């Protein structure tokens, strides 16, 4: 049987699950959007936490990476991994200065040559401008960052009309699959962070990592 060595989760992890994973020798690294949640995860036994700012794509919190990371770093003794709005060496170097020991990068790697998302999805991110992302779901406490399109315009319109959570949820059923697998970037959910405007080309993961680390090392060498 395959043995899992690491669990990462964007959902609030309960202590009973943490105990089960730890007993199996699994490293647990939950994603947190607040200091309180970071402290709770440390108390439960997390090996590290990902402090994710609202600049990231997908489900988000209310704090920015700039404000969240240093506060989490001061509040816990376990390693802090910064996420949200990081897409090059400048973002990595900044995260280290804020107190992070590592970074988590999502949106840039979505457009890597190894990524299996639809080419239309990649192209939409590459062509995105700095102001092309929007947040849906705020009215019912489930904010999600994605790129603007026909679906987000319809969703926000219904939000403003006061539609129920169930009605809004029905609108989004299957829309992530529609964008990721079918390539419908007009009616699907194109989850991507605000850093999308910085991405201009498709590269291999190796090329991305080498480019980012070279830039990071040069910047930190100035300190």
Model-inferred region functions:
Residues 19-32, 75-83:
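Short beta-strand/loop segments at the ligand-binding rim of alpha/beta enzyme cores
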Residues 67-81, 87-223:
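Conserved active-site-proximal phosphate/metal-binding subdomains
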Residues 1-13:
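Single conserved hydrophobic/aromatic residue that forms the stacking wall/gate
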Residues 25, 45, 85, 99:
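Conserved functional loop/turn residues at catalytic and ligand-binding sites
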Residues 27, 31-70, 74, 112, ...:
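Glycine/Thr-rich beta-alpha phosphate-binding loop at enzyme active sites
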Residues 10, 53, 107:
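Short secondary-structure boundary segments
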């Amino acid at each position: 049987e395959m043995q899992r060595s690491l669990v990462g989760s964007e959902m609030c992890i309960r202590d009973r699950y943490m105990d089960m994973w730890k007993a199996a020798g699994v490293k647990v690294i939950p994603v947190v959007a607040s200091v309180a949640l970071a402290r709770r995860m440390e108390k439960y036994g997390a090996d590290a936490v990902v402090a994710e700012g609202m600049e990231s794509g997908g489900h988000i919190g209310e704090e920015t990476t700039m404000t969240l990371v240093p506060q989490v770093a001061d509040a816990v003794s376990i390693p802090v991994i910064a996420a949200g709005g990081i897409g090059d060496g400048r973002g990595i170097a900044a995260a280290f200065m804020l107190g992070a020991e590592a970074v988590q990068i999502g949106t840039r790697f979505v457009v890597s040559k190894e990524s299996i998302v639809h080419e239309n999805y990649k192209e939409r991110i590459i062509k995105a401008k700095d102001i092309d992302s929007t947040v849906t779901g705020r009215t019912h406490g489930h904010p999600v960052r994605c790129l603007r399109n026909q679906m987000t315009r319809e969703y926000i319109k219904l939000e403003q009309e006061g539609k129920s959570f169930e009605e809004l949820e029905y609108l989004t059923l299957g829309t992530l699959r529609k964008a990721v697998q079918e390539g419908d970037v007009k009616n699907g959910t194109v989850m991507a962070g605000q850093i999308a405007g910085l991405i201009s080309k498709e590269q291999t993961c190796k090329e991305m990592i080498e480019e980012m680390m070279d830039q990071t090392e040069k910047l930190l060498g100035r300190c």
